[in-house]
């Protein structure tokens, strides 16, 4: 139902008063966005180095070490396209590979994402809505989290939000071809950064389809030659990489062997509300009181749905944002019943549509509903603050780098270092300061099936050196080995069990869920045995 004339007059008066107050502030009114970006930067750089590098980050760093030609080859065997890794390689050459430096390459785009979100909101709605959206975006826990990892997700947010902004400009003024050129370049960059960019293409086509319902036949942008030419150009720009993508699709079974895909939990009825909690609270919410677990996500989905349904503005801004948030979420959820890919980090960019749309919904409320609008804003900010608390609750003294540094301090020449899992291996390489050849424990299954990684997924980072890295049995260690470091989970069962009877535990160090253990091998005549055997 359309708002009454009285409600619209109330809204116009409120917005006029708000904008008048800003105009009276003089030059300060032009810097209203600065505190928002300052908040976004403070949150994304806070505790940036508190958590240790984990497996996925380690894989980014190993990929970035390759020469340009080799990087292209290995990225073709990884589960992500190469652009981020090329950029990370250049960043490290300029600023080094210290943990603050490499994570800054994600934190800075994370701040840019907030700025783009504010800009997009201002183009779609009022300055008040842009301020509200800016605060919610700056605080959004999922955006903060993935702005603090050496991965491509914050960079992807820059490409996709900027592309959406360029599309909005073009829709308003179709004669501005440069907006469409910018759109093409940004979407191509998105495709070279992450395969889920395809979801953004669907969002944009769907929005133009919605606009068709209110456009005369000759004005329908979705049928414009320029639009089709732009999409064809994106495909042409992607052609150099397309054979690699097709090759990857044909080797899904190899990716499953290495645990790169196929590890995700099957989806259920709880998955969608749980994902919304994950975006905002950094917790799946499964331990929350059941009515609250359902009510809060349903409230947000209701706000999204009602705002989009009541959207009667010419360019349907609420419809664009609802599609940006809901279409990828629900599509990936549906696909996950066949092949589970319902993962927070793959959708975190699209989650940015939620706070923007909530801000616009609050801004559109008439004055008589300002109190419920304020309550919704405070509620969402409160949940986000709890999510930030969960993000920043990190014990710096219980991190994976602790056991690695323990090994570095106590390492002796000719010691062997064996790791039980690929993710431990990828993290360990970053912190390792020894001259040892790290080895990955790959015991065959009970039926004799090998567990060695292959040339796809994480395996592409080590497979070329597999002969030196893979260790199928502890008994395969050289006969003259005297000391062995075992790196594994600190939980049972022991991934190296059973250990040879002549191994003696000398010391160990836990941290970040891992355990480093030093064993001496008590072999040969007693006088020749290493210290610890006597």
Task: Place the predicted regions along the sequence by residue.
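N-terminal intrinsically disordered, acidic low-complexity segments at the extreme N-terminus
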Residues: 2-9
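Terminal, non-globular segments
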Residues: 14-533
């Amino acid at each position: 139902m359309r708002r009454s004339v009285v409600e619209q007059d109330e809204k116009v008066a409120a917005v006029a008063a708000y904008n008048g107050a800003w105009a009276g502030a003089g030059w300060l009114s032009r810097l209203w966005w600065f505190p928002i970006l300052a908040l976004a930067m403070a949150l994304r750089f806070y505790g940036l180095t508190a958590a240790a590098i984990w497996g996925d980050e380690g894989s980014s760093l190993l990929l970035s070490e390759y020469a340009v030609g080799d990087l292209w080859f290995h990225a073709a065997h990884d589960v992500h396209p190469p652009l981020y890794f090329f950029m990370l390689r250049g960043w490290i050459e300029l600023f080094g590979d210290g943990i603050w430096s490499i994570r800054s390459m994600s934190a800075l785009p994370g701040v840019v994402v907030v700025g783009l979100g504010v800009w997009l909101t201002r183009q779609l709605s009022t300055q008040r809505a842009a301020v509200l959206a800016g605060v919610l975006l700056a605080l959004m826990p999922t955006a903060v989290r993935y702005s603090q990892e050496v991965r491509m997700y914050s960079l992807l947010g820059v490409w996709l939000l900027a592309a959406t902004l360029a599309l909005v400009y073009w829709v308003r003024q179709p004669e501005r071809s440069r907006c469409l050129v910018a759109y093409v370049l940004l979407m191509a960059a998105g495709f070279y950064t992450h395969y889920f960019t395809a979801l953004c293409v669907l969002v944009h086509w769907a929005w133009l389809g919605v606009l068709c319902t209110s456009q005369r036949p000759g004005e329908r942008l979705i049928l414009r030659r320029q639009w089709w030419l732009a999409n064809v150009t994106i495909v042409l720009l992607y052609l150099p990489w397309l054979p690699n993508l097709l090759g990857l699709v044909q080797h899904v079974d190899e990716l499953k062997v290495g645990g790169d895909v196929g590890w995700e939990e099957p989806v259920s009825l709880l998955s969608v509300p749980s994902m919304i909690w994950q975006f905002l609270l950094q917790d799946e919410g499964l331990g929350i009181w059941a009515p609250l677990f359902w009510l809060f996500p349903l409230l947000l989905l209701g706000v999204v749905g009602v705002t989009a349904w009541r959207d009667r503005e010419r360019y349907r801004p609420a419809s664009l944002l609802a599609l940006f948030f809901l279409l990828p979420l629900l599509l990936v959820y549906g696909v996950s019943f066949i092949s589970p890919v319902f993962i927070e980090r793959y959708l975190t960019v699209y989650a940015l549509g939620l706070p923007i749309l909530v801000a616009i919904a609050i801004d559109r409320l008439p004055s008589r509903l300002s109190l419920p609008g304020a309550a919704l804003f405070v509620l969402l900010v409160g949940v986000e603050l709890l999510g930030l608390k969960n993000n920043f609750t990190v014990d710096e003294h219980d991190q994976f780098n602790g056991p690695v540094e323990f090994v570095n301090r106590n390492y002796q020449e000719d010691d062997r270092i064996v790791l039980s899992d690929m993710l431990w291996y990828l993290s360990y390489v970053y912190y390792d300061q020894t001259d040892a050849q790290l080895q990955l424990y790959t015991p065959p299954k009970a039926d004799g099936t090998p567990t060695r990684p292959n040339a796809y997924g994480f395996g592409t980072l080590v497979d070329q050196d597999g002969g030196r890295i893979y260790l199928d049995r502890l008994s395969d260690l050289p006969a003259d080995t005297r000391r062995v470091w075992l790196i594994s989970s600190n939980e049972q069962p022991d991934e190296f069990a059973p250990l040879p009877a002549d191994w003696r535990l000398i010391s160990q160090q836990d941290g970040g869920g891992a355990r480093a253990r030093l064993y001496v091998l008590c072999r040969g005549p007693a006088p020749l045995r290493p210290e610890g055997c006597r």
